[in-house]
Swiss-Prot record:
Region (Disordered) residue spans: 434-465
Role played: Catalyzes the isomerization between 2-isopropylmalate and 3-isopropylmalate, via the formation of 2-isopropylmaleate.
Catalytic activity: (2R,3S)-3-isopropylmalate = (2S)-2-isopropylmalate
GO biological process, any: L-leucine biosynthetic process
Descriptive protein name: 3-isopropylmalate dehydratase large subunit
GO MF, one annotated term: 3-isopropylmalate dehydratase activity
Enzyme class per UniProt: lyase
CDD domains tied to this protein: IPMI (cd01583)
Originating organism: Salinispora tropica (strain ATCC BAA-916 / DSM 44818 / JCM 13857 / NBRC 105044 / CNB-440)
Length: 481
């Protein structure tokens, strides 16, 4: 109607509204999906469902697959060509079957696949952005809980189950109930040496692992705006760790600079048109959220988890907490169990905790910026005796980039293992695992019991803290060296 001012909307509301195919009272909205990412673990049954129903993949052009979760990252022969199609290195029969099945399914249904040995193979949430597939204003799904990573670009991205994977393969749509919205207002600036990983761990410790449940979150504030795209992806990646369905950051010149010139990004006049549209996406002045959270970035110091969920964390300056000092009995009980599993004594300074393994990698912190940060700390130093350090790039392209910069030499000369791309020690689904009782400092996203191997004990940290820990053999920040 002429003269009517549109209702102010949030970023998430704009993206949602532009993708509604069908909406009816009392029913979920039917959303069009712009990009569907696949890997070997959650897709086999979905393809079986298509096969049984005699259906095809509706939009193969919007469907991309890669091999990442089960893939080994250590090879005797360092040549990429030796890895092309080579399943002999996958010794676990279940893992090998899943990889073989993904290859057959992609060949049968015409889905683009980046397998082991491919120059674009890697962790699904690393290759999407680096290939320019992830773009502002998109809807993106994957059968993986850390799909929220792509929200760093202003996309509505979330993980789905295997039955939903089949639905998207068959229809390129997905029924979804409209979620509530939440703003995370990050005030102040991060101090030098404090990273995006520290910020998001501090946030989860503040709000708890259920603080975002049922919400699509938007991260806002000057501290967020000052982050690189790699830092923003770290923040968005861990949205699920505090219960949020998705986590978005409004696109800006930093976003556009990252995307410009990437293989699948718009070019020429299409680029100008895309940027003009993307600039309309940020939340309107006057738009309201269902709830808001405030975090003071200036008060954050290097952070580490002490327990068995990402919310059980504290400043590296702190000591192991006393469970009896928590506010509620469920929190006290969870802390008691965590300390028992982690074999920690109340009051022990966190800096006194020794580690057996250090892992740098994952879809949280396996990008080139993360590897540079770790290398800056390790340069000219050695990994402590008795400590094993694995550095695993998030993609083959990240690995190639790092080697072009000489980072691989920094790592290997320090005594770390320089590996091939994959999910690696983030989860115990491939050969890179902890042994029972081993303690690790890890740049991944989850520290659940047994997450990195049965009986393994995980402390989540940033790449600089991981590198400093490798040098000292105990939890440490670079300033401690």
């Amino acid at each position: 109607m002429v003269g009517v001012t549109p209702e102010p909307r949030t970023l998430a509301e704009k993206v949602w509204a532009s993708h509604v195919v069908r909406s009816a009272d009392g029913e979920p909205d039917l959303l069009f999906i712009d990009l569907h990412l696949l890997h070997e673990v959650t897709s086999p049954q979905a393809f079986d469902g298509l096969r049984l129903a005699g259906r095809r993949v509706r939009r193969t052009d919007l469907t991309i697959a890669t091999e990442d979760h089960n893939t080994p990252t250590g090879y005797a022969d360092p040549s990429y060509q030796s890895r092309r199609g080579d399943l002999l290195t996958i010794t676990d029969p279940t893992s090998r079957t899943q990889i073989e099945t993904l290859r057959r399914n992609c060949a049968e249904f015409g889905v683009r696949l980046h397998p082991l040995g491919d120059e674009n193979q890697g962790i699904v949430h690393v290759i999407g952005p680096q290939l320019g597939l992830t773009q502002p204003g998109m809807t993106i799904v994957c059968g993986d809980s850390h799909t929220a990573t792509h929200g760093a670009f202003g996309a509505l991205a979330f993980g789905i189950g295997t039955s939903e994977v089949e639905h998207v393969l068959a229809t390129q749509t997905l029924p979804q109930a409209r979620p509530r919205t939440m703003a995370v207002n990050v005030v102040g600036d991060l101090a030098p040496g404090v990273t995006a990983k520290d910020l998001v761990l501090a946030l989860i410790a503040q709000v708890g692992t259920g603080g975002g449940r049922g919400h699509v979150v938007e991260y806002r504030g000057e501290a967020i705006r000052k982050l690189s795209m790699e830092g923003r992806m770290t923040i968005a990646n861990m949205s699920i760790e505090w219960g949020a369905k998705a986590g978005l950051i409004a696109p800006d010149d930093t976003t556009f600079g990252y995307l410009r010139g990437r293989p699948n990004a718009p070019a020429g006049a299409d680029w100008e048109a895309a940027v003009a549209y993307w600039r309309t996406l940020p939340t309107d002045a006057g738009a309201t959220f269902d709830s808001e959270v405030t975090l003071d970035a200036s008060q954050i110091t290097p952070f580490v988890t002490w327990g068995t969920n990402p919310g059980q964390g504290a400043s590296l300056d702190a000591s192991v907490p006393n469970p009896e000092e928590f506010a509620t009995e469920p929190e006290r009980a969870a802390a008691r169990r965590a300390l028992e599993y982690m074999d920690l004594a109340v009051g022990t300074p966190l800096r006194e905790l020794t580690v057996d393994v250090v892992f740098v990698g994952s879809c949280t912190n396996g990008r080139i910026e993360d590897l540079r940060a770790a290398a800056d700390v390790l340069r000219g130093r050695r990994v402590a005796p008795g400590v094993r350090m694995l550095v695993v790039p998030g993609s083959a392209a990240v690995r190639e980039n790092a080697e072009a910069e000489g980072l691989d030499k920094v790592f290997t000369e320090a005594g770390a293992e320089w590996r091939f791309a994959g999910c690696s020690m983030c989860l115990g689904m491939n050969p890179d695992t902890l042994r029972p009782g081993q303690r690790a400092a890890s740049t991944s996203n989850r520290n659940f019991e047994g997450r990195q191997g049965r009986g393994g004990r995980t402390h989540l940290v940033s790449p600089p803290v991981a590198a400093a820990t490798a040098v000292t053999g105990r939890l440490a920040a670079p300033a401690d060296l």
